[in-house]
């Protein structure tokens, strides 16, 4: 098998990322050399690659589904929104500009060249390249500058599968309409459809799928069921709805639950940090946006932000800032990560991200943050709570810690020996702990299993949850691998494999009809 295809969607969050991840895992299990690709992503959930670049977290997950180390090749252009109108532009893993729509147009020729070069390189190296679109190709107002949907498909002659989310309703109209509004040469690349998140008896849907095939001349390759047990790293903030749970809580090992309230910041970044907590039996994690929701939580997490000063102002306006201060004063557990850590310091000086200058923080931690370029992008390893830790840093802020004690020791080397043996390297103190609060710049910290267990025991003790017991064997990596295998099983079972292989190897069939709006 050799080829490439593009998985597009009728909307954002239709399921493009998970379908690509499932296909990647399915093909990798068969021994196919497969790689993911997303030409341009817009997301504040990102990871750091081994070579110090930054890519969307969804592409990192897809890479792991393929058995590959995440690389900037898989996501050469990343836009990180800092406001409704401006985003940080990351090219081949490095921030190069902060752009609005007009500024972005200046870069488009160079970006097309970057995208074309990376995709050509991957197609030469791998048997199959599975590309993911962005948003929806039906956003025809953006067609002239499109890098990730039909612009990519046309440039690289890629067949396209369109995914629609039936759980939101109107999926048949979405699928038909997506094709119908495209220009004729784009329509000719649409090879088929996938219906995602279906609940119930699929036979009841078949008449609609048959009619869709009559109207469009294109088949539906499969109907993927709504799998409540399936949850994977969120690509963007659409999955972080206030009052919504994270993952699916599992019954506690002991007699008590540990409840976690994760603050849903308006410009939240790396929201996936809390998913490691949700892997633990007896830990229930929920997104919150009101101060009243903090009262009953055993632990509050303040995650990262792409607009630290703006989100700090939001904490103050909503009363969450004062509620956080009161928690810490009372000795009740709070974990602040990256931007959240900076907000809880005494002072922020920001001439880089927001241009706001000097801003007072919430004063929980005795530290000052000054934003500077270039951005810190690094993988780290170290020790915390007597256990090895691994993670990564993505931030402009440089902190000066004064009175608070650090609680981590780190080294800027992802594979360094840190366990005290004769090859161990010296560690640099990192983070702050004071009262009931811990702060750190390190994302992914809670995925270090031994550290997470030891730290949760301390959190439970401080919260008075003496009946809470940490499971002795929870592995975040194993949970994620199991989720990818479950997803691959669903894709393998419910998608027409023969049709998929034909599209991959032969491209979109010739002679597909061109639809016109209003056609019936």
Curated annotation (Swiss-Prot):
Keywords: Cobalamin biosynthesis, Glutamine amidotransferase. Pathway: Cofactor biosynthesis; adenosylcobalamin biosynthesis. GO terms for molecular function: ABC-type vitamin B12 transporter activity; catalytic activity. The keyword Lyase does not apply. Pfam families: CbiA (PF01656), GATase_3 (PF07685). Catalyzes amidations at positions B, D, E, and G on adenosylcobyrinic A,C-diamide. NH(2) groups are provided by glutamine, and one molecule of ATP is hydrogenolyzed for each amidation. HAMAP family: CobQ (MF_00028). Belongs to the CobB/CobQ family. CobQ subfamily. This is Cobyric acid synthase.
């Amino acid at each position: 098998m050799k080829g490439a295809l593009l998985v597009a969607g009728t909307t954002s969050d239709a399921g493009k990322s998970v379908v690509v991840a499932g296909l990647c895992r399915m093909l990798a299990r068969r021994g196919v050399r497969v790689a993911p690709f997303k030409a341009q992503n817009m997301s504040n959930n990102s990871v750091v690659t081994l070579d110090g670049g930054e890519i969307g977290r969804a592409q990192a997950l897809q890479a792991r589904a393929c058995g590959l180390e995440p690389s900037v090749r898989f996501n050469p252009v990343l836009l990180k929104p800092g406001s409704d109108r401006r985003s940080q532009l990351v090219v081949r893993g490095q921030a190069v500009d902060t752009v609005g729509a007009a500024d972005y147009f200046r870069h488009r020729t160079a970006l097309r060249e970057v995208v074309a070069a990376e995709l050509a390189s991957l197609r030469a190296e791998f048997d199959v390249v599975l590309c993911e679109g962005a948003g929806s190709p039906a956003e025809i107002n953006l067609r002239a500058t499109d890098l990730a949907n039909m612009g990519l498909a046309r440039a690289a002659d890629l067949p396209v599968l369109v995914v629609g989310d039936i759980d939101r309703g109107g999926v048949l109209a979405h699928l038909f309409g997506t094709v119908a509004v495209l220009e004729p040469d784009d329509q000719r690349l649409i090879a088929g459809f996938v219906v995602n998140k279906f609940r119930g008896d699929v036979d009841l849907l078949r008449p609609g799928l048959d009619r869709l095939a009559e109207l469009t001349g294109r088949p539906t390759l499969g109907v993927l069921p709504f799998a409540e047990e399936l949850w994977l790293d969120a690509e963007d903030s659409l999955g972080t709805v206030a009052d919504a749970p994270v993952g699916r809580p599992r019954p506690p090992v002991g007699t008590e639950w540990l409840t976690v309230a994760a603050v849903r910041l308006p410009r939240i970044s790396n929201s996936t940090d809390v998913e490691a907590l949700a892997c633990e039996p007896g830990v229930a994690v929920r997104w919150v946006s009101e101060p009243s929701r903090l009262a009953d939580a055993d632990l509050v997490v303040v995650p990262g932000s792409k607009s630290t000063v703006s989100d700090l102002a939001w904490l103050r306006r909503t009363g969450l800032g004062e509620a956080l201060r009161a928690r810490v004063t009372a000795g009740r557990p709070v974990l602040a990560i990256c931007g959240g850590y900076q907000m809880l310091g005494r002072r922020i000086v920001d001439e880089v991200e927001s241009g706001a200058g000097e801003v007072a923080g919430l004063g929980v931690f005795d530290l000052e943050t000054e934003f500077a370029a270039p951005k810190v992008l690094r993988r780290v390893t170290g020790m915390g709570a007597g256990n090895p830790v691994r993670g990564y840093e993505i931030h402009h802020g440089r902190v000066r810690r004064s009175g608070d004690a650090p609680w981590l020791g780190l080294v800027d080397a992802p594979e360094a020996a840190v366990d005290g043996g004769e090859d161990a390297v010296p560690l640099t103190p990192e983070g702050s702990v004071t009262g009931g609060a811990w702060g750190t710049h390190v994302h992914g910290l809670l995925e270090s299993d031994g550290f997470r267990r030891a730290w949760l025991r301390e959190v439970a003790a401080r919260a008075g949850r003496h009946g809470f017991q940490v499971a002795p064997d929870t592995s975040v990596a194993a949970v994620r691998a199991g989720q990818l295998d479950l997803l691959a099983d669903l894709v393998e079972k419910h998608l027409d494999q023969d049709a998929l292989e034909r599209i991959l190897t032969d491209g979109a069939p010739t002679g597909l009809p061109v639809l016109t709006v209003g056609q019936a």
